[in-house]
């Protein structure tokens, strides 16, 4: 025995109170830091870190405005244009505007009207009419709003039954400043190795941003609570729904937090009941639950201590740690009870020593191999998935330490209980498996081959195309709000098409003299201007002139005609609106440039700035895509748009940029396929190597990998057959499945090897293994599968998938390791004859 082993047994067996005091102190320390634990469901946590489209998205967001606004749909019981409804909308709008972080609230009461009655350009310079203006003709206003190319399906539904309010938040300059600092250093890191000073700067910048981001999310969550409280005061007379990215972020965090608390406690209670039924002694319930709690507290505290937020992807890490810790506990408890039944007169401490000695090696390799399975996620290239891999690596390490430090130290202090080893239902089940596979070994093999073929076919049906709306149940506000906005307000998910001027345009242009034209056309407003200063944009801009505007119109009509797109806005929309004022002005470049210069600033901010750069050389088409469309194929849609603009409309490829959250999310989904293939390849190679080290037998290592491959492929195959898409949550299922299957495989092979040495009879060794280690495997699988079935009650669909698929993967791992693996061992005889 090594000096390290002697020291370990000295601490556990002779100084258990000191060991417990030390461990308790550490757990309390981390429990204190758990107060800093936080969740992060922001869009920044759900995108590819080195995505060039993300960099471009942030540039466009800074130039044209952010997607981070709230959208309130308002469906009144009375007529939308009645005085009482307009009064209620005004009161609601004013209350929302009083929120400190709100910059503005845009409603149908605030937008400029130009046909109610018809006005001239000079009228607009003097006064802009709105729905509340005394001069406004209410009948004409109704017609204008319902038929406006700008407002219809943006602020009012086409049937006039519903309106929408856009709540714009003030830009948090500090947040964006810290974000930019961090991103600049991250980008530099991708280009070249950072110097020590730069690494420190990146560390500080990341820490500062994380801290500020946490407070920013907390404020945003409070704002949304305030908005909902204000909305509740107006629900008597109208149906209201809340939408927008900030709301989705906040509600996702609430769902995750709810699942962590409610279902975490529910799973815990269910596991306690199941352990009580199985082991029928209080100590075998209390000890494993204390160890599971200690592991969870340590990990939550550690994440809080290092300010490492949990995302939608990694939100199930506590559940997984519970699985892994409990699995280790069950194997130790079953082994102790076996030894107690065999060595009835043995000393309590000696039984614990034997329990540890016989289980430390397989448990160590189980933990190590499971770590390898989760560490494989690090190669995915997706930040939240990478973080999840690291979290599980640290968490599994802690679970192993807790299992072999806290559990035996507590067990030593308890007086031994007498127990005779007797058969039970579990023994009958595992014995039945052993007898059945001996009689029907060929049928077992054929069955698994059929399952494998079906799994491969199912895997070929796997898709990454999924709808964000499918994350939520139909009765949730997010789901209902998205459906309503899709049906009545022209789509949910933002997509921008940005088109630059061609590269060869940026050269000095001849200024076209426009003298003598002033006498030919009366604009109806004062032309006190300097021609050199004011008559410039149509002559210097590539797009904002009548040579190019028909092309812009054609692009707009193409985008608007796509079945996947709802509301499309562009400079073409704005010019259609202005054309109703004076078509001659819009059709003449010189006067169009004057119009652009002289139009009031609030009109310019509404009609020009969101859709065209200041120099007129870049266009932005804002599109809302129908998120609830079951036929939505993001990648195909983006490729179709790009192909049409380049191949059919003659634009250069470098001119066309697609951006927005739809593009970023699509990039993430597409990378999932690549990372899934890469992840599984890496993990199986690594596990094969770990098996070889653990078993020191290449043939046994190759046999042992088979149940793991089948378990993982079956789960992925089921996902394919059931049309469950690969997304940012379900990508981790394969790694989870492999990690769980590895646990069973290593314990079974180690026990089989021990039993085989007794008489070198393969089938007898298998029967003894089934009746010993098979029991522990069965207990673990049944307990955790039933426990995690509670997650099926969640409102968050990814949590439901996680609970059910995890349970299914455990059952498949158990079946493969208790049936197929023994058959392969007997057939191929890895230990010789």
List each language-model region with its residue ranges.
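Hydrophobic transmembrane alpha-helices and their membrane-interface caps
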Residues: 284-333, 700-749, 789, 816-820, ...
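Helix-loop junctions and hydrophobic alpha-helical segments within the transmembrane domains
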Residues: 339-368, 756-779
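Signature of alpha-helical transmembrane segments and their immediate interfacial
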Residues: 1-41, 404, 408-409, 413, ...
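Interfacial segments of transmembrane alpha-helices in multi-pass membrane proteins
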Residues: 257-310, 379-383, 678-723, 793-797
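Alpha-helical transmembrane segments of multi-pass inner-membrane proteins
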Residues: 18, 262, 266, 314, ...
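Extracytoplasmic
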Residues: 58, 62, 135-277, 281-282, ...
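Juxtamembrane segments of multi-pass membrane proteins
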Residues: 440-589
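Hydrophobic, glycine/alanine-rich multi-pass transmembrane helices and their short helix-loop junctions
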Residues: 274, 303, 364-406, 411-412, ...
């Amino acid at each position: 025995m090594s000096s390290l082993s002697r020291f370990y047994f000295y601490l556990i067996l002779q100084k258990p109170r000191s060991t417990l005091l030390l461990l308790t102190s550490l757990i309390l320390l981390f429990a204190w830091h758990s107060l800093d634990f936080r969740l992060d469901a922001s869009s920044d946590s759900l995108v590819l870190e080195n995505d060039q489209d993300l960099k471009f998205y942030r540039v466009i967001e800074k130039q044209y405005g952010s997607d981070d606004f709230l959208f309130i749909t308002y469906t009144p019981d009375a007529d939308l244009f009645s005085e009482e409804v307009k009064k209620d909308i005004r009161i609601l709008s004013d209350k929302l505007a009083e929120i400190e972080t709100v910059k503005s609230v845009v409603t149908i009461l605030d937008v400029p009207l130009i046909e109610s009655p018809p006005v001239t350009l000079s009228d607009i310079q003097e006064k802009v009419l709105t729905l509340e203006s005394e001069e406004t003709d209410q009948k004409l206003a109704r017609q204008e709003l319902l038929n406006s190319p700008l407002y219809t399906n943006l602020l009012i539904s086409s049937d006039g039954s519903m309106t929408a309010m856009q709540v714009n938040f003030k830009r948090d300059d500090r947040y964006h400043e810290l974000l930019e600092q961090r991103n600049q250093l991250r980008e530099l890191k991708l280009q070249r190795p950072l110097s020590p000073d730069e690494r420190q700067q990146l560390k500080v910048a990341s820490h500062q941003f994380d801290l500020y981001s946490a407070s920013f999310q907390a404020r945003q969550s409070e704002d949304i609570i305030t908005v909902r409280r204000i909305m509740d005061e107006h629900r008597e007379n109208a149906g209201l729904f809340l939408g927008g990215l900030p709301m989705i972020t906040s509600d996702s965090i609430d769902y995750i937090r709810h699942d962590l608390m409610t279902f975490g406690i529910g799973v815990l209670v269910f596991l306690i009941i199941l352990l009580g039924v199985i082991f029928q002694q209080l100590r075998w319930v209390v000890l494993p639950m204390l160890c599971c709690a200690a592991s969870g507290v340590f990990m939550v505290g550690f994440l809080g201590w290092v300010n490492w937020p949990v995302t939608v992807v990694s939100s199930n890490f506590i559940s997984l740690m519970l699985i892994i810790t409990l699995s280790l506990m069950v194997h130790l408890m079953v082994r102790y009870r076996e030894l107690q039944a065999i060595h009835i007169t043995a000393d309590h401490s000696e039984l614990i020593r034997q329990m540890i000695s016989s289980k430390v090696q397989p448990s160590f390799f189980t933990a190590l191999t499971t770590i390898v399975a989760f560490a494989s996620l690090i190669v995915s290239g997706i930040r939240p998935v990478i973080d999840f891999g690291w979290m599980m690596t640290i968490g599994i390490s802690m679970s192993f330490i807790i299992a072999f430090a806290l559990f035996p130290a507590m067990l030593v202090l308890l007086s031994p209980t007498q127990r005779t080893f007797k058969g039970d239902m579990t023994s009958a089940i595992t014995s039945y498996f052993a007898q059945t596979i001996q009689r029907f070994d060929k049928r077992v093999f054929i069955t698994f081959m059929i399952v494998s073929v079906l799994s491969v076919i199912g895997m070929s049906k796997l898709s990454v195309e999924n709808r964000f709306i499918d994350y939520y149940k139909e009765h949730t506000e997010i789901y209902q709000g998205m459906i309503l906005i899709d049906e009545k307000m022209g789509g949910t998910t933002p997509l921008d098409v940005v088109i630059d001027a061609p590269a060869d345009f940026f050269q000095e242009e001849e200024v076209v003299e426009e003298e003598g034209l002033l006498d030919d056309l009366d604009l109806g407003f004062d032309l006190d201007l300097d021609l050199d200063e004011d008559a410039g944009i149509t002559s210097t801009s590539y797009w904002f002139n009548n040579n190019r505007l028909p092309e812009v119109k054609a692009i707009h009509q193409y985008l608007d005609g796509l079945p996947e797109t709802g509301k499309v806005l562009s400079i073409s929309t704005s010019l259609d609106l202005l054309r109703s004022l004076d078509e001659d002005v819009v059709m003449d470049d010189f006067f169009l440039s004057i119009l652009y210069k002289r139009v009031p600033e609030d009109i310019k901010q509404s009609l020009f700035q969101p859709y065209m750069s200041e120099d007129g050389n870049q266009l932005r088409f804002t599109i809302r895509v129908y998120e609830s469309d079951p036929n939505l194929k993001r990648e195909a849609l983006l490729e179709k748009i790009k192909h049409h603009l380049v191949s059919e409309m003659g634009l250069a490829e470098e001119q066309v940029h697609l951006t927005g959250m739809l593009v970023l999310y699509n990039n993430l989904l597409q990378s999932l396929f690549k990372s899934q293939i890469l992840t599984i390849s890496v993990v199986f190679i690594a596990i094969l190597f770990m098996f070889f080290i653990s078993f020191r037998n290449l043939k046994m290592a190759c046999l042992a990998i088979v149940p793991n491959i089948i378990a993982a492929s079956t789960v992925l195959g089921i996902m394919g057959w059931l049309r469950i898409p690969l997304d940012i949550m379900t990508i981790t299922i394969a790694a989870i499945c492999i990690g769980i299957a590895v646990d069973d495989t290593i314990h079974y092979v180690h026990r089989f090897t021990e039993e085989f040495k007794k008489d070198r009879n393969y089938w007898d060794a298998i029967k003894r293994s089934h009746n010993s280690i098979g029991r522990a495997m069965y207990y673990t699988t049944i307990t955790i599968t039933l426990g995690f079935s509670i997650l099926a009650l969640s409102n968050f669909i990814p949590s439901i998938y996680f609970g059910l698929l995890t349970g299914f993967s455990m059952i498949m791992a158990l079946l493969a390791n208790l049936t197929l693996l023994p058959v392969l061992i007997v057939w191929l005889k890895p230990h010789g004859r």
